[in-house]
């Protein structure tokens, strides 16, 4: 049985709102439905949520489930990074679709910076990530994958995630197996772990799913198990 990535990585929505404007954005729909903020296109910072980082039980956190890192104000980013440094027991992930708008250096050992790539025309984002975000760890999320990305330069990347369209739109378009498999092969040749999201199981078969996590994330999950005993 495939693993749900949400069981391995917890959302911490410190910033809500995004200026990118993707037509298929689930976050915008959720914000509108639950009235989280007044205007999704005007991101808001919720520093009170930083207290969640103080818990001693290790956790893998995604900090951009309801935002894009490119839309964070520099002072928000600085405050979050300072808190991350104080809590090395956790691993933290960030995602952006606009790495061209970022420009910073960080030596954080437990922060992972990634880009979303949905089609071949967006492969430039990987190069922009490596150029504009000088960091210890990089990841790429190919989700939802709309076409065959072909040969991808994954040098310096530490993890890739592959997924398909979900929700009502999944009836119109989905990721093809012949797009996903070459990505996994390219990553494995470089020793990069691959995680196929659970929504791919009906497309490629549950028995064919590859669901690998970076060793740093696995260590967090192992410690979590010991805390439950």
Named regions from a protein language model:
Residues 118, 122, 173-176:
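Short capping loops/turns at secondary-structure boundaries
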Residues 79-82, 129-137, 174-186:
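Long, well-ordered alpha-helical scaffolding segments within enzyme catalytic domains
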Residues 86-92, 134-137, 184-194:
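Structural alpha-beta junctions
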Residues 67, 98-100, 117-119, 144-146, ...:
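Active-site-proximal loop/turn and secondary-structure-junction residues that shape catalytic pockets
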């Amino acid at each position: 049985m495939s693993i749900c990535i949400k069981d391995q990585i917890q959302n911490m929505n410190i910033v809500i709102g995004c200026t990118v404007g993707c037509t298929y954005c689930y976050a915008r729909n959720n914000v509108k439905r639950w009235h989280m903020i007044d205007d999704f296109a005007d991101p808001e910072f919720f520093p009170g949520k930083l207290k969640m980082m103080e818990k001693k039980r290790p956790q893998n956190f995604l900090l951009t489930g309801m935002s894009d890192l490119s839309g964070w104000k520099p002072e928000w980013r600085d405050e979050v990074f300072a808190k991350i440094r104080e809590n090395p027991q956790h691993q933290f992930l960030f995602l952006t679709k606009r790495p061209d708008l970022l420009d910073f250096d960080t030596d954080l050992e437990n922060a992972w910076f990634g880009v979303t790539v949905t089609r071949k025309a967006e492969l430039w984002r990987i190069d922009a990530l490596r150029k504009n975000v000088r960091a210890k760890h990089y990841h790429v999320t190919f989700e939802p994958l709309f076409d065959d990305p072909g040969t991808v330069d994954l040098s310096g990347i530490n993890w890739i995630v592959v997924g398909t369209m979900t929700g009502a739109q999944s009836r119109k378009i989905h990721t093809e197996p012949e797009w996903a498999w070459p990505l996994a092969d390219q990553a494995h040749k470089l020793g990069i772990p691959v995680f196929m999201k659970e929504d791919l199981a009906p497309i490629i078969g549950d028995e064919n799913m590859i669901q690998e996590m970076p060793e740093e994330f696995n260590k967090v999950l192992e410690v979590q198990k010991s805390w439950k005993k």
